[in-house]
Amino acid sequence: MKNICILGATGSIGTQTLEVIREEKENLKLYAASANKSSEKIISIIEEFEPKYVSMTDKEAFLKVKEFCMKNNKNTEVLYGIEGMNTIASLDKVDIVLTSVVGMIGLEPTLKAIRNKKDIALANKETLVVAGEIIKKEAHENKVNILPVDSEHGAIFQCLLGNLKGDINKIHLTASGGPFRGKKREELENVTVEQALKHPNWNMGKKISIDSATLMNKGLEVIEAHFLFDVDYEDIEVVVHPESIIHSMVEYKDGSVIAQLASPDMKLPIQYALNYPIRKDRVIEKLNLFEIEKLTFYKPDLKTFKCLDLAYRAGKIGGMMPTILNSSNEYAVELFLNKKIGFLEIPKIIEECMKKFYTKEEQSVEKIIHMDKIIGEYIREKYN
């Protein structure tokens, strides 16, 4: 039995992780969970899964959940704030921590978990984007597995099994193209939030849905792949694959290309990461190749979807630049979701911040947190 801690248990990935745990009660146990404001959802989780600990980052939600547990004689301990997240991520009895919180808030508890020798099922790609070198170093020193919880990196991970790193020629990172695939820049001038949230293939949260529409999600995944698999940026190629059946491919020096195919369902990479290195019975719809009939591939349009190009540039510059890219994107997406800016202003704000805040300083956790803070203050003051 594996004891699971989910950071971000009420979001899209967290909810699908609970579905996997529900299917595998004999193998997986929800030991701890965190959420922000979703007190009603956490209460439902407490009633069904009976975790030993939950943590809420919102004070009002914390008090509501705590009151519920006291009134109903629940044995779940309720914690509060980032300190609560750090605590549940490093509990002795936790075997693996699934980090599915959105954004920079995942950095500190992920590091706490690694330093307490917990394997990480990583759905919070921002953590690796902003602190890739730090995370890699800490994971190596503490002999911790970083298991990717997304379809693309989970696919690459599997395509690399049994092969030598030195034999890799190229990683082909697939992208659906998002809801605006094939459109030109001028067609995106008046895109609405509602249109941008309608992803053709995947069921995701709001922030990642907007990132998928701008192709920033793929850009962040390029940086993530660089750190996860120690592959140069020149050897990571994004391939637009609208069907989302091939989740990524690895090309080897002898010309062989190994691909991982499956129905587009996040429960598969979640299940694989939680049970690694064992494969369990299928929790997703079986892939029927005869129904698919054809698979198509295109080059990404970097002029229309500038965020992908910006991500490559930030990754190659390195240092603090991926932090600047990520933070400016987070705040720009927040403005777009709140209808304060247009869709095409997202890459403009990111590029502006990459120029304004560029520094040759090396990474540290403190510098990353400070950079995120000053970028947030700058963007909110200028654009609100």
UniProtKB/Swiss-Prot annotation:
Q: Does the keyword Metal-binding apply?
A: yes
Give the encoding gene's name. dxr
Q: What does this protein do?
A: Catalyzes the NADPH-dependent rearrangement and reduction of 1-deoxy-D-xylulose-5-phosphate (DXP) to 2-C-methyl-D-erythritol 4-phosphate (MEP).
Q: What species is given as this protein's source? A: Clostridium tetani (strain Massachusetts / E88)
| Positions of NADPH binding | T10, G11, S12, I13, K37, N124, E126, G205
**Reaction(s) catalysed by this chain's protein:** 2-C-methyl-D-erythritol 4-phosphate + NADP(+) = 1-deoxy-D-xylulose 5-phosphate + NADPH + H(+)
Q: Which InterPro entries match?
A: DXP_reductoisomerase (IPR003821), DXP_reductoisomerase_C (IPR013644), DXP_reductoisomerase_N (IPR013512), DXPR_C (IPR026877), DXPR_C_sf (IPR036169), NAD(P)-bd_dom_sf (IPR036291)
The protein in question is named 1-deoxy-D-xylulose 5-phosphate reductoisomerase
What HAMAP family does the database record attribute to this sequence? DXP_reductoisom
Q: According to its UniProt record, in which pathway does this protein act? A: Isoprenoid biosynthesis; isopentenyl diphosphate biosynthesis via DXP pathway; isopentenyl diphosphate from 1-deoxy-D-xylulose 5-phosphate: step 1/6
Required cofactor names: Mg(2+); Mn(2+)
Give GO terms: molecular function aspect only: 1-deoxy-D-xylulose-5-phosphate reductoisomerase activity; manganese ion binding; NADPH binding
UniProt keyword rRNA-binding, yes or no: no
For the ligand (Mn(2+)), the binding residues are D150, E152, E221
Q: Which UniProt key words apply to this protein?
A: Isoprene biosynthesis, Manganese, Metal-binding, NADP, Oxidoreductase
Q: Which GO terms describe its biological process?
A: isopentenyl diphosphate biosynthetic process, methylerythritol 4-phosphate pathway involved in terpenoid biosynthetic process
Family statement drawn from the similarity comment of this UniProt entry: Belongs to the DXR family.
Provide the top EC class: oxidoreductase
What's its EC? 1.1.1.267
Give residues annotated as binding 1-deoxy-D-xylulose 5-phosphate.
K125, S151, E152, S176, H199, S212, N217, K218, E221
Domain of life, per lineage: Bacteria
Q: Which NCBIfam families match?
A: Dxr, PRK12464.1
